[in-house]
């Protein structure tokens, strides 16, 4: 499982889980330094991307199917083949997540056919964006594949920068990739961060966001298109491309029914909350395909805060754990508060299992939370092998789910 992360926080796709490397008090949120507030906004942006873009839906299906394979007793080769296919394409569309050398300076960008994917899956006929950078001689350069992951991180950085005075990043992978690509390919469009943010947001509505981003940018240059508003960009894209938030509610519900099976605990509020986040994502996209950028386009900073707070209020907040092991959530359905605590258990178990579903020796991922909360179910075994926790003074959710999944 790959996290989306920067130096101060991370977001775990599909599991709707935010982790911050700082202590944060949401009762006094605005009293924190801009860097702390910006980090939260950055990771929260990934949550919005997860529940309102094709990129997020693809991550949910891929990662959750992989998790379900790990916990199944009956594992067959057919399931593994399907999982490998989905994961290969998901990883391909996501592109590279790190590079060998920073800072990076773009030398050339090209869209090419991927021969490796074609060899593995004949007839797939997929394009990829290759970015050559830090060129020293004619044939000596570094390169990376530009895909959804770079776009998601670039967008999240632009969002946090639009709301708070965070540290400026320059030529830093992956946060400045979309900015630098726009400067290299269409400098006139790169003059406005909001325009770049909007193109990022619209690109994440496509399966193959990388090639779409480049093709759309090239078309804008060809047409000498210079927007005056975010709405102009949305209308331009709608004129030449058919894009939208693609996903299947039935698939999400089917996956969740296995992650949270029927038992003596009622998981229906959690499942309903997750499904309704995607439904809200669809509703926001119907209002505007780039509603995040639209909410931040005003030059009035208070208007940006107000609109962003409306989005947060509507979507709520997934489980968030800070550096001190304190965890926060903000979920409700029909004005009734929903407890998301059980969502931590599948996430923890996923980290404790390898791709074959075998236990990886090590501490429980929730140990800091239990230590901070002085949880009665916590014991020293949690630091070595949480399966051997013999403390009977409390109910350990990880151990409970472990038994429910019938894991060894």
Task: List PLM regions with ranges.
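Non-catalytic terminal regions of proteins
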Residues: 1-55, 64-65, 169, 173-408
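Short, solvent-exposed segments of well-ordered alpha helices
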Residues: 31, 35, 143-150
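Low-complexity, serine/threonine/proline-enriched polar segments
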Residues: 70-123, 313
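A long, hydrophobic alpha-helical segment
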Residues: 128-144, 165-166
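Post-HEXXH active-site segment of zinc metalloproteases
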Residues: 30-34, 50-92, 134-138
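An active-site-proximal "capping" alpha-helix that borders the catalytic cofactor pocket
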Residues: 149-164
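Active-site-adjacent bridging/hinge elements
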Residues: 17-18, 120-136
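Cation-handling catalytic/transport regions enriched in His/Asp/Glu
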Residues: 111-120, 139-148, 157, 169-170
């Amino acid at each position: 499982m790959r996290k989306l992360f920067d130096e101060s926080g991370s977001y775990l796709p599909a599991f709707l889980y935010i982790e911050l490397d700082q202590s944060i008090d949401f009762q006094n949120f605005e009293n924190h330094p801009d860097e702390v507030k910006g980090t939260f906004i950055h990771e929260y942006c990934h949550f919005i991307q997860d529940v309102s873009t094709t990129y997020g839906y693809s991550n949910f299906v891929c990662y959750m199917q992989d998790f379900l394979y790990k916990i199944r007793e009956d594992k067959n080769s057919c399931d593994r083949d399907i999982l490998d296919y989905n994961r290969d394409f998901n990883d391909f569309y996501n592109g590279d997540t790190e590079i060998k050398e920073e800072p990076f300076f773009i030398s050339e960008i090209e869209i090419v056919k991927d021969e490796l994917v074609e060899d593995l899956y004949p007839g797939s006929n997929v394009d990829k964006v290759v970015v050559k950078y830090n060129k020293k001689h004619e044939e000596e350069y570094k390169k990376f594949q530009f895909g959804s992951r770079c776009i998601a991180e670039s967008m999240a950085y632009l969002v946090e920068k639009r709301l708070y005075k965070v540290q400026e990043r320059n030529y830093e992978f992956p946060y400045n990739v979309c900015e630098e690509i726009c400067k290299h390919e269409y400098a006139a469009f790169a003059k406005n961060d909001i325009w770049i943010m909007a193109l990022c947001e619209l690109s994440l509505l496509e399966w193959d966001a990388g090639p779409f981003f480049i093709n759309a940018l090239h078309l804008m240059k060809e047409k000498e298109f210079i927007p005056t508003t975010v709405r102009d960009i949305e209308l331009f894209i709608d004129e030449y491309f058919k894009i939208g938030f693609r996903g299947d509610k039935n698939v999400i519900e089917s996956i969740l029914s296995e992650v949270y099976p029927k038992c003596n605990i009622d998981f229906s509020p959690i499942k309903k909350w997750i499904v309704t986040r995607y439904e809200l994502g669809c509703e926001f996209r119907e209002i505007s395909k780039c509603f995040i950028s639209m909410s931040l386009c005003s030059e009035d900073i208070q208007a940006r805060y107000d609109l962003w707070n409306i989005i947060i209020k509507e979507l709520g907040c997934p489980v968030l754990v800070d550096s001190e092991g304190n965890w926060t959530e903000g979920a409700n359905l029909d004005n009734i508060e929903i407890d998301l605590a059980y969502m931590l258990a599948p996430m923890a178990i996923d980290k404790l299992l390898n791709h074959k579903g075998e236990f990886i020796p090590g501490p429980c991922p929730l140990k800091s939370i239990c230590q901070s909360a002085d949880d009665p179910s916590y014991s020293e075994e949690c630091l070595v092998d949480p399966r051997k926790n013999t403390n009977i003074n409390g109910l350990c959710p990880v151990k409970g789910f472990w038994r429910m999944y019938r894991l060894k």
